[in-house]
Amino acid sequence: KFFRRIYVSTNPDYEISRFLTERMKFKYTPAYKGSINVELAGDNITLALMQELVPNQGDAWKYMLEVIDGVFDNLTAKKIKVAKLPHLELFKTIKINNIPPEIIDWAGLTLFLRVRTLAQRTAEMHIALGGDTTDTAFTPTTYNGDYTVWLKNRLIYQFQNRLNTIENNLHKLDGLALELAHQFLDKKKEIRKHFLDFDWTKLKSERIRIHGDYHLGQVLVNGDDFYILDFEGEPESTIRDRKVKQPPLKDVAGLFRSFHYAIYATIFNNKDKYPFELEELFSAGETLFNYMVGVFLDTYIEKAQEGNLNIGYNKEIAFLLKYCILEKAVYELGYELNSRPRWAVIPLRGIASIMEY
């Protein structure tokens, strides 16, 4: 892989790939095989990275779209009554054998088994990323005032930017998206307050180096298993910001937003073949999403705690997850309003569910 964008610093993809392969022997990422770096005025600049080829059947995004399409086809094939599907509260953990039979009958078992495997691999990645006590670039660290100032400055700037974007693009929206956009604007003070309510003194968990841009497109499907790749971090962030240690739950939040997108993308791309009202499809999608999240969290939390990864207790986990999902959905909103306004309903729906309006 030759990097198109060159930074006056080591590329995080090189740094993390090498660390996971050589230091932590983490198997579920393409193994680091070499790199081309240039020493320039004391800086180490990464030009290229070589990794082992992982045999695969495409990425997890493509895989999820196919599986979820089958789940929505089942609404008709199995004459499912959407309103009667048992609901699960968002972020409530659930074991696969406790999922109601009506949900298994509709969505099948395979989807939840794959979600469980992905949760396990994600936890193992985080345990590896936070498992070194000698290399200061990777040593876990606590929350502090400096991190909090950095975080709030970034988020409030981004939030203000998105407010301006939504106000300038309301004319592109209609139906549910327009309704949710107005609610977003009505709730802007509460959302801003939510971002400012980050009190590091109450947090007992640790920050580590994370993937930073974790979504289904960054995961390769290998049979029944998954490999994680592309550790470059969030494209909009500076190289310095990408190396800041963050809550591992930020990656989990990114993946949950990707689950949400996969469900809504399936609806938008195939809605003419599903004989249901759009609102009914959205309702079924939200139910499916909550069960996927519940299964993922049950496995992820259990594995993380077994591996001594300090992600905090339940209340802290819920706070960080909501905080990071809100951050991610606000980030997505700007992209959708500028690129494909029809899809703005996806992040707007995500924001509404976190803020509970």
Q: Which ranges hold each PLM region?
A:
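Hydrophobic core residues within well-ordered beta-strands of beta-rich domains
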Residues: 47, 208-210
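An alpha-helical support segment within catalytic cores of ATP-dependent transferases
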Residues: 162-208
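Conserved ATP-binding subdomain of kinase catalytic cores across diverse folds
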Residues: 1-168, 216, 222-314
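ATP/Mg2+ or Mg2+-diphosphate-binding catalytic cores
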Residues: 283-309, 319-357
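Conserved catalytic-loop position in the HRD/HxD motif
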Residues: 213
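Active-site micro-motifs of SAM-dependent methyltransferase domains
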Residues: 193, 221, 257, 261, ...
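Active-site-adjacent structural elements in folded domains
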Residues: 195-202, 311-319
